[in-house]
């Protein structure tokens, strides 16, 4: 950590070190100075790729764990899950996402106007598959 010369360990340089410091030989050619600074940037890519690898391993582990711990679905249970549960949830997502945008519209029916929960009657019917 101390070799990175970052905030806890960045030592103040004196005036003699500014004119005759360790960076003096790199100031005449910018290629050498750029190579020194680019060598420190590889740590960011190593850190990013290691975090990406850890996340990838966690996803693969959770996938394999769920496959190994749950029993196989019967075909009729799978069809019930897809058609009765997932299908209704997937098609209700746009209804609930667009509900805040439709709240400013006035209802023209005088019997439904200003009645509580009148806007959610259609959502309940859609959710029940009616």
UniProtKB/Swiss-Prot annotation:
Is Transport set as a keyword in this record? yes
Q: Where in the cell is it found?
A: Mitochondrion inner membrane
Q: Which Pfam families match?
A: NADHdh (PF00146)
- Tell me the GO molecular function terms: NADH dehydrogenase (ubiquinone) activity
Membrane-spanning residues: 45-65
What membrane topology was assigned to this protein in its record? Multi-pass membrane protein
Q: Which GO terms describe its cellular component?
A: mitochondrial inner membrane
Lineage: superkingdom: Eukaryota
EC number(s) from the headed UniProt entry: 7.1.1.2
Biological-process GO terms, alphabetical:
aerobic respiration
Instruction: Give the catalytic activity.
Output: a ubiquinone + NADH + 5 H(+)(in) = a ubiquinol + NAD(+) + 4 H(+)(out)
Q: Which UniProt keywords apply?
A: Electron transport, Membrane, Mitochondrion, Mitochondrion inner membrane, NAD, Respiratory chain, Translocase, Transmembrane, Transmembrane helix, Transport, Ubiquinone
Role played: Core subunit of the mitochondrial membrane respiratory chain NADH dehydrogenase (Complex I) that is believed to belong to the minimal assembly required for catalysis. Complex I functions in the transfer of electrons from NADH to the respiratory chain. The immediate electron acceptor for the enzyme is believed to be ubiquinone.
The family assignment reads:
Belongs to the complex I subunit 1 family.
Q: What is this protein called?
A: NADH-ubiquinone oxidoreductase chain 1
């Amino acid at each position: 950590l101390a070799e990175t010369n970052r905030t806890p360990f960045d030592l103040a340089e004196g005036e003699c070190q500014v004119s005759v410091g360790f960076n003096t030989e790199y100031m005449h050619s910018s290629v050498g100075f750029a190579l020194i600074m680019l060598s420190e940037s590889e740590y960011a890519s190593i850190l990013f790729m290691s975090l990406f690898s850890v996340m990838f391993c966690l996803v693969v582990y959770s996938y394999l764990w769920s496959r190994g711990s749950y029993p196989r679905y019967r075909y009729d249970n799978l069809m019930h899950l897809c058609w009765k549960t997932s299908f209704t949830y997937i098609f209700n997502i746009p209804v609930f996402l667009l509900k805040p945008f439709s709240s400013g519209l006035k209802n023209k029916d005088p019997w439904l106007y200003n009645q509580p929960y009148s806007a959610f009657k259609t959502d309940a019917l859609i959710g029940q598959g009616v």
